[in-house]
Amino acid sequence: MKVFLYIIRGISSGKNYVGITNNLERRLNEHRSGQAKGGQVIGDFQLLHTEEFTDYETAREREIFLKSGQGRQWINKTILKTRPARGG
């Protein structure tokens, strides 16, 4: 079974959403139509990144990582190519 991890970014909000699905096209259409269950509503979005896995467990582990602090840093550095702002 193919499982897809995806990262989308709200165009107006600038917020990222990380999710997994077994049908990427259907899931993105659910986000577009506002029918995505369990996810935040981000409006119009841009698909930033996808990864394909052969099993749910591995995809879920990757999703959990990308939702962590280190994972968000990886997204910023690798996908968005930015550095987090440093407060002082």
Regions found by a protein language model. Name each.
Residues 1-38, 43, 50-53, 57-67, ...:
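GIY-YIG nuclease catalytic motif and its immediate N-terminal context
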